[in-house]
A protein has these predicted regions:
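Carbohydrate-binding/catalytic loop surfaces
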Residues: 1-3, 37-51, 87-106, 147-168, ...
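Extracytoplasmic mature domains of secreted/periplasmic and thylakoid-lumen proteins
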Residues: 1-51, 55
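CBM-like carbohydrate-recognition segments
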Residues: 2-6, 12-19, 156, 160-161, ...
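Inter-helical turn/loop segments and adjacent helix faces that build the functional surface
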Residues: 8-12, 59-70, 114-126, 176-185
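Long, well-ordered core segments of solenoidal/helical folds
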Residues: 16-37, 66-89, 129-147, 190-207
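Oxyanion-binding "anion nests"
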Residues: 110-154
Length: 252
């Protein structure tokens, strides 16, 4: 939020927000200035590709300091080594191979946001872009052809259709199309189907259908399959639906 405020405010009002972005990104460096292997506090789950990578990239954009782009690339590589499965999907954490829905939506959206601000001349850009495109290509094959949804566990079609993951993946794909990273002929129909699916699961009063509850590291596939699906208001799912809406509306 404060990264967006830093970009959208006038110069005088942007300064405190930009400073917050820089301070958060600086957690990835030791007191000596040496770059850490990953961003601390949130580096054990695939969520971290979303939680940390775009923020650190934004610090690079706001300050013009290349070290932040280097850190973002290093953090992404660290997380891939930790949670990327051999088949290209992401496990949520090393505790289990389960490809949790939101645990794959986080890397998809995190990379889409990070690449939007990442310099094309950086040595890591080509790899990060290739990984984004590869992951989206794979995720597309797991979209439910009937209702346009992705599921609570990506490769378990018997798990419930999950709204927040669908919104996040749809958003990531739409961003990729808008930026010219993804082929519209291949992906726009999938985005449109996902958008209709999300619209059908968001009520006029903000009620949501089938949003997975807050989920920490779980010990087994069955734990993800049995996570509660929220019926009602949920800030997490609502935020992702709103972000998807702004992307579909092509808002700056």
């Amino acid at each position: 939020m404060f990264a967006e405020l830093a970009e959208r405010s006038d110069l005088e009002h942007a300064k405190p927000y930009a400073e917050l972005v820089r301070k958060a990104a600086d957690l990835g460096f030791a007191k000596s200035g040496e770059m850490l292997a990953s961003m601390p506090f949130h580096d054990e789950m695939s969520d971290s590709v979303f939680m940390a990578t775009p923020l650190v990239v934004k610090a690079g954009k706001l300050t013009g300091e290349r070290k932040y782009f280097d850190l973002a690339a290093r953090h992404f590589a660290f997380m891939q080594k930790l949670v990327l499965r051999d088949d290209g999907l992401y496990r949520h954490s090393p505790l289990t191979e389960a490809a949790w829905g939101r645990g794959n939506a986080f890397p998809a959206l995190g990379l889409a946001l990070a690449l939007s601000d990442f310099p094309k001349d950086h040595p890591a850009y080509a790899h990060m872009m290739a990984e984004f495109q590869r992951h989206i290509f794979l995720l597309a094959h797991f979209q439910d052809a009937e209702d346009g949804m992705w599921h609570q566990v990506i490769d378990q079609p018997g798990s419930y259709a999950e709204t927040s993951a669908t919104a996040m993946i749809g958003l990531a794909i739409e961003r990729g199309i808008r930026k010219g990273w993804l082929d519209p002929a291949m992906y726009q129909p999938r985005v449109d189907q996902a958008w209709r699916a999300v619209l059908a699961r968001v009520g006029n009063g903000g009620q949501l259908v089938d949003v997975c509850e807050s989920t920490n590291k779980q010990n087994a596939l069955e734990d993800y399959l049995h996570r509660a699906a929220i019926l009602g208001p949920d800030p997490r799912g609502g935020a992702m639906a709103m972000l998807f809406a702004t992307e579909m509306a092509d808002l700056p």
